[in-house]
C-alpha cells in the first residue's frame, strides 16, 4: 500500500514537474501583449524562432494560436502560404487566423477563423521568407531542401511543444503551397513524425503544364476572349508555342520563357485599355493597373506590411531583431532560386499520399492564375486508389444557410480525394469568402461532407421559401400597430407624462 502511494506521489510530482518545465519552455515563446489585440479574443498565442542555426542555414519563424474550443484541443492545423517565398502571415492576419487588421491599425475578430476548429500553426518558410532568415546570402531553395529543412524545424517544434506530438495534424495552404504541402507531408510521413489527418490545397500550383494548358480555355469560358476573334487567334498561337516548349523539356521543368510570354500577352491584351489597365490575375472580377495586374492585391497588404514591420509588433512576436529588421510579404530571392532549380509537378506525390491521407483540392472560381480548370484537368488524369479520376461522378452543390438561394460552391468526393469549387471566390478563398471556406473545411476536418447543405436553407428565424418574405413584410405592420396602440394608451391614461392636458398651446407672437 505504501509503495503504491509512493508511486502515485512520484508520478504526480513528475507530472507537475513536466508541466512546470513545459511552462518554462513555453514562456519564451508566449505572446504576452500583441498590439491592438481585440479585447474579446480569448485565445493564447506562441511565436518566435527555435534557434536552429546549428542545424539549418538560418531560422524559421512560427506563430501558433491555441484552439479556443476545448473539443478540438488535440487537432492541429499547419497553414502555409505560397510564392515561392511568401509569408504565411498572409494566412494568419488576412485569411484563417482569429483576427484581421483594418486600415485603422485595429484588429477585428475574423468570422472565418480556424482556431475554432483546432490549434493553428503558421510557419514562414522556406528560409528567407517573412520573419524567417537565412545566414547564407546565396542560399539554395528547392522542394527537397525546403521539405528537409521543415522536417528539422518540426522535430524541434514538437520537442518544445510535446503536447502537440500526439495531435491529429492537417496541413493546409494555397497557391505554391501546392508544391510545399505534398513534399512536406511526404517527408513527415517518411520520418513518422505526426499523425496526418489530411491535406487541403487551395488554388494550388501543382502541375505547371495544366495551368498553362487551361489559361485560354478559362478566358473563353468566362467570356473574356472570343476564340474566333483576332485576339483569340493570336493568343492561341502564343499558347501553342508554350505547349511546344513543354513538349521539348518533357518533365515540365526547365525553361518556361515561352509560357511566361504567353501569360504576359494575356495580361497585356485582355483589357479594355491594353498597356494601362488589366485584369487582376487573382480575381477576375477586379480590375488592376498594368503591369501590376493584381500583384498589389489584397489591398490590406499596405497596412499589414507597415504594421508587421513595426518594432512593437516584432517584439511582441519574439522576432530575432538582430537578424530581422522588417517584414516583407514575399522574398524575390527565394522565388529566383526556385526558378533556377526548375519546378516539377507534385501530382505524383499527391497520387501516392491520397492512398492513406484524405486530400481536399479547393478552388476559388475567380482565380485566373491557378484556375479550377487546371484542377479539373489534373484530377481527370490522376490515378488513385484503384481508378482514374472521379469515374463520371457528378459534383454536388452546397449552400450556406440563410445566405442565398444560389449555391455557394460544389464538390465531388471519392476514394479519399475531394475536389471543390467556391463561387465568385478569388485565389485566396478564405480572404473574401471566409464563411464558405469555413463550412467546407469543417466538413473536411470531420470527414463528413454529407453535413454540407445540398439544398437552400434560409435562416431558421425567417422560415423558408416565400414565408421569409411574408415575415419580413409583417415586421413593419406589427411595429406600426404597436406604435399607434402605445400613443393611444399614453393619451388615454397619461402614461409617461404624455397626457393631453400636460402642455397648453402657445399662440404665435404677433
Swiss-Prot record:
Membrane protein topology class: Single-pass type I membrane protein
One protein family per Pfam: Peptidase_S10
Signal peptide coordinates: 1-21
Residue ranges that the UniProt entry lists as topological domain Lumenal: 22-468
Molecular function as annotated in GO: serine-type carboxypeptidase activity
Superkingdom: Eukaryota
Transmembrane segments: 469-489
Name the UniProt record assigns to this protein: Pheromone-processing carboxypeptidase kex1
Organism per entry: Schizosaccharomyces pombe (strain 972 / ATCC 24843)
Name of the coding gene: kex1
Amino acid at each position: 500500500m505504501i509503495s503504491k502511494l509512493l508511486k502515485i506521489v512520484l508520478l504526480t510530482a513528475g507530472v507537475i514537474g513536466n508541466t512546470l518545465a513545459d511552462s518554462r519552455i513555453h514562456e519564451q515563446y508566449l505572446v504576452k501583449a500583441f498590439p491592438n489585440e481585440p479585447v474579446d479574443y480569448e485565445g493564447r498565442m506562441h511565436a518566435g524562432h527555435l534557434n536552429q542555426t546549428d542545424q539549418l542555414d538560418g531560422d524559421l519563424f512560427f506563430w501558433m494560436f491555441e484552439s479556443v474550443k476545448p473539443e478540438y484541443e488535440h487537432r492541429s492545423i499547419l497553414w502555409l502560404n505560397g510564392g515561392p517565398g511568401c509569408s504565411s502571415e498572409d494566412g494568419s492576419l488576412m485569411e484563417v487566423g482569429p483576427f484581421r487588421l483594418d486600415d485603422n491599425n485595429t484588429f477585428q475578430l475574423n468570422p472565418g477563423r480556424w482556431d475554432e476548429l483546432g490549434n493553428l500553426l503558421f510557419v514562414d518558410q522556406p528560409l528567407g521568407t517573412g520573419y524567417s532568415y537565412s545566414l547564407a546570402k546565396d542560399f539554395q531553395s528547392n522542394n527537397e531542401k525546403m521539405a528537409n529543412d521543415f522536417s528539422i524545424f518540426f522535430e524541434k517544434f514538437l520537442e518544445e511543444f510535446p503536447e502537440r506530438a500526439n495531435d491529429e495534424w492537417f496541413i493546409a495552404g494555397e497557391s505554391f503551397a501546392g508544391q510545399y504541402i505534398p513534399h512536406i507531408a511526404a517527408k513527415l510521413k517518411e520520418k513518422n513524425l505526426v499523425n496526418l489527418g489530411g491535406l487541403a490545397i487551395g488554388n494550388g500550383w501543382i502541375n505547371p503544364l495544366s495551368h498553362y494548358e487551361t489559361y485560354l480555355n478559362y478566358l473563353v469560358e468566362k467570356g473574356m476572349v472570343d476564340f474566333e476573334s483576332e485576339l483569340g487567334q493570336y493568343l492561341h498561337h502564343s499558347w501553342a508555342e508554350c505547349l511546344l516548349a513543354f513538349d521539348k523539356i518533357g518533365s515540365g521543368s526547365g525553361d518556361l520563357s515561352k509560357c511566361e510570354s504567353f501569360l504576359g500577352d494575356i495580361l497585356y491584351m485582355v483589357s479594355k485599355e491594353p498597356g494601362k489597365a488589366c485584369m487582376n490575375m487573382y480575381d477576375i472580377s477586379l480590375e488592376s493597373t498594368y503591369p501590376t495586374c493584381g500583384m498589389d492585391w489584397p489591398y490590406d497588404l499596405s497596412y499589414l506590411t507597415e504594421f508587421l514591420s513595426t518594432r512593437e509588433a516584432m517584439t511582441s512576436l519574439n522576432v530575432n531583431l538582430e537578424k530581422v529588421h522588417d517584414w516583407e510579404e514575399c522574398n524575390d530571392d527565394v522565388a529566383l532560386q526556385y526558378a533556377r532549380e526548375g519546378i516539377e509537378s507534385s501530382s505524383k506525390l499527391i497520387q501516392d499520399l491520397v492512398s492513406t491521407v484524405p486530400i481536399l483540392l479547393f478552388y476559388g472560381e475567380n482565380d485566373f492564375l491557378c484556375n479550377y480548370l487546371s484542377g479539373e484537368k489534373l484530377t481527370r488524369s490522376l490515378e488513385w486508389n484503384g481508378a482514374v479520376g472521379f469515374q463520371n461522378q457528378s459534383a454536388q452543390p452546397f449552400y450556406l444557410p440563410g445566405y442565398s438561394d444560389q449555391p455557394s460552391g460544389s464538390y465531388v468526393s471519392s476514394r479519399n480525394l475531394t475536389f471543390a469549387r467556391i463561387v465568385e471566390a478569388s485565389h485566396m478563398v478564405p480572404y473574401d469568402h471566409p464563411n464558405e471556406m469555413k463550412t467546407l473545411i469543417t466538413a473536411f476536418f470531420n470527414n463528413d461532407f454529407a453535413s454540407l447543405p445540398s439544398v437552400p436553407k434560409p435562416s431558421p428565424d425567417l422560415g423558408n421559401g416565400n414565408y421569409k418574405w411574408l415575415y419580413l413584410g409583417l415586421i413593419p405592420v406589427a411595429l406600426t400597430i404597436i406604435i399607434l396602440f402605445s400613443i393611444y394608451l399614453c393619451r388615454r391614461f397619461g402614461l409617461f407624462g404624455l397626457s393631453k392636458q400636460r402642455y397648453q398651446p402657445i399662440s404665435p407672437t404677433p
